[in-house]
Amino acid sequence: MIRVSNIHLSLDYDDKSVRKAVAKQLRIEEKAIKSVKIFRRSVDARKKDNIYFLTTVDAELNINEEKVCKKCSNTQIARKYEYNQMKFGNAPFPVIVGAGPAGLFAALILARSGANPILIERGRDVDRRTADVNRFWTSGKLDITSNVQFGEGGAGTFSDGKLNSGTKDIRQRKVLEEFVSHGAPDEILYNAKPHIGTDMLKGTIKNIRNEIIELGGRVMFETKLVSMAFSDNKLKAITIETENGNEIIETDNVILAIGHSARDTFEMLYDLKLPIEAKPFSIGARIEHLREKIDKAQYGRFAGNEKLGSANYKLNTHLDNGRGVYTFCMCPGGRVVNASSEENRLCTNGMSEFARNAENSNSALLVGINPDDYESDHPLAGMYLQRKLESKAFVAGGENYNAPIQRVDDFLNNRKSTHLGDVKPSIGPNYEFSNLNEIFPEYISSSMAQGIIKMGRMLHGFDDGDAVLTGVESRSSSPVRIMRKTDTLESVLIEGLYPCGEGAGYAGGIISAAVDGIKCAEKIIEKSNR
């Protein structure tokens, strides 16, 4: 198999046109090609009058591929990625805390190794969790144990199911292939910006859970980690809380994949004197535009083409005050969702289903902050800042989980909104007109305002006065890092404890978290064979 990059294909390409383009680039006859398959595909929309797919194609030839590869640029012999699944040795079963991407993939790899892992999750299974979330979005009745942050699949379950990642780790291919084998669409294997969609992601998560159980693993929902026991700096046991009371599980290996919103667990770890440090993260709001306007701005006359789907964007700018402002977790044809998980505190996120065909498109508009901005040097100071702003958002929304919203024009002019334009907020249970400038510290609100203006020059209409801001977006990443060793991935203090994934500060998104879960599982398997 030969891999050919930099192949330009029209939006209506078919197998015949792919073969023709590959033959031309390889300078061979079409009949020398046995088969072709898209390996990677992205949209090149830099010229609005000539939008095309930029692709990498795997081609099987019936002539000597090595010779062809040597004489042509942008080619290489394609090597199929094969994951080496190790077997578990003679050791007690491990426990994984948290059933987000990191925890699920750690449990899957451990189950396949024969480790019979226990996976505990403080929230509910994805079906009951979905019912709880939908009830909250319609009635405003929050369940602090089952919500957008807690439950099977983690916080990413109620997002766009975005699978793009900055990590170059080869295991990311493994993650994508596992998603497909458990029910995700094949296109995530080749799209440069793959996504599953919230609707499809739920079924995929259940299928992963079922395989873990079939292989001898145990999955416990509504089960919360409340304490751990150590001896001679080694993990000996954990205490869990269930509906039947507390229970002690003796184990010497625990993967701590708790997610970025397990604040009570962060406090428990701090009380146990585990080394934790405050880390930089970002705060801002969701910004919502009409999908058709974003599509037009990105795709010009090609807007609405079903091959392109709803348009994406990713913007960032550096301000004179030294801060970075950027968009994050863009949800084309999606909705803004109420992602609250604590009583009397409110935060937001974005979500799309696979079709991405809702009326609006949205993204997080975030300002980078660092520990120098926090109100103290406490390791959990970033978390306390999150809580403070979420409490102010809750009050601004009317103290009933309605979200505070504001038109961009009003935000830029520091006045409370009193009416809507052509963009209707999509968040539930409802919204309240507000002035977000009164929620954020000045350094955040002024940076957001400057960012909106500068990004309006990058993407036509981004600074539309009728665009809607919904606050606050405070959970884009973890505010802490649980310190671990670079070689064993264990806590720098406690042997057998593996801080893992986004909540521990070692990932940012579904793919990188899943990869980190796999890496932690591998370390436990390696140790079991010593």
Describe every region a protein language model picked out.
Residues M1-F53, V57-F158, K162-R530:
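Residues forming the flavin
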